[in-house]
Amino acid sequence: MSLPHIDLLYSLSGLFVGILVGLTGVGGGSLMTPILVLLFGVHPATAVGTDLLYAAATKATGTLVHGLKGSIDWRITGRLAAGSVPAAALTLWWLHTHGMNTPGTARMIQLVLGIALLLTSLALIFRPQLTAFAARNPLVPSPARTLWSTVLTGAVLGVLVSMTSVGAGAIGVTVLLLLYPALATTRIVGSDIAHAVPLTLVAGMGHWLLGSVDWSMLLSLLLGSLPGIVLGSLLSARAPERLLRNLLAATLVAVGVRLVLA
């Protein structure tokens, strides 16, 4: 069996994205998938499928760290997964029935990806204001309403992530901050990262079964991104986080508009 080919350009892209993820905490999907589609000309379905398994590997590392710190609320993680995993399976079935590699499906994935990037940029820009608003005016819904709102949030994320690999990070955290204003932000982030592991793994394996995963590309990306995340995390204490987030949000707006109008 031949060894997979390592592409240096993919590894350098992974390093760049990994550093940004470590610096800002923004999920790699919102960065890596557009790079693969727009810069490398990768088919949208292959870019999404490969990035999902890439995300599963990186999120698993983050889950281990948060688990050791005790900053995961497994109740929230379970509620999200109860909605997202079935929604991911249904979305993959829908993509399969419509033809994963047809021009129409490629255009639809690209359009939804652009919309997801625009939503992610809004979540990044307005998260501080939403967090402050939630702290001043905490919602006090019934336990049942909170439960089903969380499951519904998971279902929406399941559809978005399965189609675009984007949404589990910035969008998920922002909604959880509104649903659980009394919970520490670190526990919300940890719970969201832990939820992303089964979601991206199920969605990624589904894409693999449908033939839209490039394993050589995946390995090349991971070889660059894993050390990049470590480096970015080490530099994060010295980096101007607010400036980086605003620049990143502006970039996502530009890329999102480009994908929607393409």
Map each language-model feature to its residues.
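Transmembrane helix boundary and interhelical junction motifs in multipass membrane proteins
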Residues: 25-32, 165-173
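Juxtamembrane transmembrane-helix termini in multi-pass membrane transport proteins
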Residues: 24-77
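Interfacial segments of multi-pass membrane proteins
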Residues: 32-45, 171-187
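Transmembrane alpha-helix boundary and packing residues in multipass membrane permease domains
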Residues: 34, 51, 92-93, 174, ...
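Alpha-helical transmembrane segments of multipass membrane proteins
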Residues: 18-19, 35, 39, 63-64, ...
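Juxtamembrane transmembrane-helix boundary motif
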Residues: 1-13, 38, 65-163, 206-209, ...
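Conserved glycine-rich helix-kink/hinge and helix-boundary motifs of the Major Facilitator Superfamily
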Residues: 49, 189-190, 249
